[in-house]
Amino acid sequence: WNSYSFLVTYANIDNWKPQSEYFKPEDLTNDLDRWIMSYLQSLTKEVNEQMSAYKLYNVLPAMVNFIDNLTNWYIRRSRRRFWKSGNDQDKLHAYETLYEVLSILTKLIAPVMPFVAEEMYQNLELTAFPNAAPSVHLRDYPEVDEKFIDRELEEKMSFVETAVRLGRILRNEKNIKIRQPLSNFTVVANREITQNAV
């Protein structure tokens, strides 16, 4: 819900509206945008597999983990893109990406959070596209688009997240405030992919 509120708040401030129902992830150049789209496709694949196997108990934790990463990693790292004045291509891509993620996520969560999904759908999709289906529950369930899954990028981002989390733990242990700059921070990586991530 926080991600949805963030998008709606800043979209209203900038008077931004989605231009088309057909988003093009292949046009994205920002690594954060490409990562969240890849992660969303991985989530879509996992949710479909788990639901097909009637393992609904595995669906909600995967969704919660995704939402946590969306709000606490993607949006926090992208905030300055939304805050800057003017509407350059990077800012527009940030809006388009977050809108697309929330649009697909709304459909993914509909079976397990029907009322939240419906509220988000009514405000996101129907406001922008009045000819869309009148309810999220009348839309096709999302299917994975494998070509947008980038496992290497997801692994790199996971490593960076882990490094940041461990850095916060060390800051806490040493009583160093988050906003205080560090003179240096050493990350040890034993694999080439993780070395490239840093």
Feature-to-residue mapping (PLM):
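Aromatic-lined ligand-binding clefts that engage carbohydrates, nucleic acids, or primary amines
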Residues: 60, 64
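Acidic, turn-prone loop/beta-hairpin segments
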Residues: 14-45, 76-166, 184, 188-191
